Design a protein with these regions (language model features):
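Bacterial N-terminal signal peptides
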Residues: 9-17
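Surface-exposed loop/turn motifs at beta-strand-loop junctions within extracellular Ig-like
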Residues: 18, 67-69, 625-629
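Sec-dependent signal peptide cleavage junction
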Residues: 16-34
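Extracellular modular ligand-binding repeats in secreted and cell-surface proteins
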Residues: 30-83
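Secreted/processed peptides and extracellular or luminal domains of membrane proteins
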Residues: 20, 71-74, 213
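Long, low-complexity, intrinsically disordered N-terminal extensions of eukaryotic proteins, enriched
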Residues: 12, 22-25, 65, 529
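Carbohydrate-active catalytic/glycan-binding domains of CAZyme proteins
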Residues: 32, 78-644
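Positively charged n-region of N-terminal signal peptides that target proteins for export
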Residues: 1-9
Length: 644
């Protein structure tokens, strides 16, 4: 009888394992991924005779394998290059315009990191970001690397794909690779990449090169993406690893005290993710690998709910504190939602200290702006809606609450590059939220007495360079003033992923991914009242008469129009000066006779007019389009000024 029972049980087990829809099969499907650890042949450790570079003195790194005694060493340059070693000229960052990367490339969420390149024998900036490689969905299944020498942020090199999960997706990801980050452990000479494999895991991998590549089937540590969404990494000098992320309700509801704090908060956006910070164990294979968890308390209220985009900067010497950036959700005076601002917090104790809202030294008092939601506590450092602008009459940076560029999500980080603090974020292009481009600007980092301050940068076409020559060709897609500007939310699935709120009546920048295409990235759907602006153009130190050449394509209706050219602001009331006008009538276009054809078949025409006023110095330049019709009057691709 006993044998019969055992035989029956064995048959039942075999039957269950063969059935396709069983609980056992489901359990196997939902089990953690079978990652393998990266096994190095050597385990190198930094030696006591090593020392790091300063701004003026080079460094030395010496490593010995703890297992076999094998060793190697190398020297590093000073952190600041006074002259470009390739040209011998003084470093100016000329040419480091926005967007920062080639127009066909779309890398949002970029975290800038400065690492020593042993292959190039120089300090380089590496951008670790998502990849909007299709334009029909957030973030593809690969990460694409770009890097540049710290002394020339116009000299970007594509270093190729450094992680691709499109074939194996061992973590179970079905959407794509969201915002990554990377940190260097000087103690082991290794680079740790934390990736966000959406709807599955945040995965920590290791490599011995800042460009990887990292193997998609390897992991040193991982956690549910619901626990750590949009992860960021910081490695302290002693090698301790810290991971920051946004935590979702399904996880923090397991912590009653956190759930109660969030429930009592006045956060109204419906995005109730909150900031989480983890200290990992020295032995990442020990249990869950987590040594301690902090929930980012701050001095203004119990806990800070944030939706996404944390960037754990870590220790900043100039401020004497740890710094943490996050996406700021706030409401403008017109009731519009903004998540284009990135804000910051600071603490003097990473895991146990109080988190304080940072200061940005900009007066943000504004009528009816007392109902902000998560951000805008005077701590915005980057806003790609253009609401932080230099007043042309005073020269002071101010908060205007007037968007001058399509606003949508933003995400980025800070790096000290050749002695200057550079903040990287992204802007929206195309008619969806899936064609974001890397942008940059220089911020000021300093102590005001004992108060840490990070002063934001003005979102500008000239970016880190400060200005562009008016006498060199400017691509129209470099605009950072494109009005009327509207919200750029995630698209719906209707109409080929074009969101109904991305109105047909507003100009936008076309999004091309073909690096060989001609006249493929431009300002499209201009109408009466459209303004396209560029900050800043340098006309030189001598006052001179100028002429303007523009490359335009008329709208389908062939609408007659003209464009007024303004300096400093697009209206006299705002402090602008009209420089001249250019006729875009059918007769003017026909008289030109100088045309070029784009890859998409669009016929472009060069028009040229002498300006009515002489000009000198550095100015914002604004093109104000006018027509008697409300139909689309055309598109705008390039322009250049000439003297005389």
């Amino acid at each position: 009888m006993r044998k019969q029972i055992l035989a029956l049980l064995l048959c039942l087990v075999l039957l269950v394992t063969l059935l396709p829809g069983t609980a056992l099969a489901a359990k196997k499907k939902n089990s953690p991924p079978a990652f393998r650890h990266h096994e190095y042949e050597h385990h190198y450790q930094l030696q006591d005779d090593s020392y790091e570079s300063t701004d003026t003195e080079g460094g030395y790194r010496h490593y010995v394998c703890a297992d076999c005694g094998d060793e190697y060493s190398y020297t590093t340059d000073p952190l600041v290059y006074e002259t470009n070693p390739k040209t011998g000229e003084r470093v100016t960052q000329a040419g480091a315009y926005n967007p920062l990367l080639p127009s066909w490339e779309h890398i949002p969420d970029a975290e800038p990191q400065v690492f020593w390149s042993k292959e190039d024998n120089e300090w380089r900036v590496y951008l670790y970001g998502s990849h909007d490689d299709t334009g029909v969905g957030y973030c593809g299944f690969n990460y694409m690397m770009y890097s540049a020498p710290v002394y020339d942020l116009s000299d970007w090199r594509c270093d190729g794909v450094y992680l691709d999960i499109s074939e194996h997706a061992t973590s179970g990801a079905t959407v794509g690779l969201f915002a990554p980050d990377c940190a260097y452990d000087v103690n082991t000479d290794q680079y740790y990449l934390i990736s966000n494999e959406f709807n599955a895991y945040s995965v920590l991998r290791v490599a011995d090169n800042p460009c990887g590549p990292w193997d998609e089937q390897e992991a040193e540590w991982y956690a549910s993406v619901k626990f750590i969404y949009d992860p960021s990494i910081y490695i302290d000098r002693d090698g301790t690893i810290f991971i920051a992320g946004s935590c979702m309700k399904t996880v923090y509801n397991e912590y009653p005290e956190i759930q109660e704090m969030v429930a009592a908060d006045d956060y109204k956006s419906g995005m109730s993710h909150i900031g989480v910070l983890m200290q990992l164990k020295d032995d990442l294979s020990d249990g869950d690998g987590i040594e301690a968890i902090s929930w980012l308390p701050n001095d203004a209220r119990g806990y800070l709910p944030i939706y996404e985009g944390p960037s754990l900067q870590g220790w900043v010497d100039e401020l004497g504190v740890y710094v943490y950036f996050y996406v700021s959700y706030d409401v403008g005076a017109d009731g519009s939602w903004y998540n284009s601002g990135l804000a910051w917090l600071w603490t003097d104790d990473l895991m146990n200290g109080t988190w304080h809202f940072g200061e940005n030294a900009v007066d943000e008092s504004y009528v009816d702006l007392d109902y902000v939601i998560s951000g805008n506590h005077g701590n915005i450092v980057s806003d790609t809606s253009g609401r932080y602008a230099v007043d042309p009459t005073t020269g002071e940076l101010s908060f205007t609450d007037f968007p001058t560029y399509a606003y949508g999500n933003n995400h980025g980080g800070l790096a000290r590059v050749n002695g200057h603090w550079i903040f990287i974020g992204h802007r929206q292009t195309g008619r969806t939220a899936y064609s974001r481009q890397t942008v940059a600007g220089e911020v000021e980092v300093y102590l005001d007495g004992e108060t840490p301050v990070i002063k934001p940068f003005e979102f500008s076409s000239s970016g880190v360079a400060g200005s562009m020559s008016a006498y060199e060709m400017v691509n129209a897609d470099r605009t950072t003033w494109l009005t009327p500007a509207v919200d750029h939310p995630a698209p719906s699935t209707e109409n080929n992923n074009i969101h109904s709120e991305c109105k047909d009546f507003d100009p936008y920048i076309t999004a091309s991914r073909d690096e060989n295409a001609v006249h493929a990235t431009y300002v499209a759907e201009l109408r009466n009242g459209s303004v396209v602006g560029y900050k800043y153009l340098d006309f030189g130190t001598d006052e001179t008469a100028v002429a303007l050449r523009m490359l335009v394509a008329p709208g389908e209706a062939g609408t007659d129009a003209e464009v007024s050219v303004w300096l400093d602001a697009p209206t006299a009331e705002a402090g602008g000066t009209q420089l001249g006008t250019v006729s875009l009538t059918a007769d003017a276009l026909a008289a030109s006779g100088e045309t070029e054809t784009g890859t998409d078949g669009t016929v472009w025409t060069w028009v040229e007019e002498a300006m009515q006023q002489p000009v000198i110095g550095v100015h914002g330049v604004y093109f104000v389009f006018a027509s008697a019709s409300e139909e689309i009057l055309g598109s705008f691709d390039q322009f250049i000024f000439s003297k005389g």
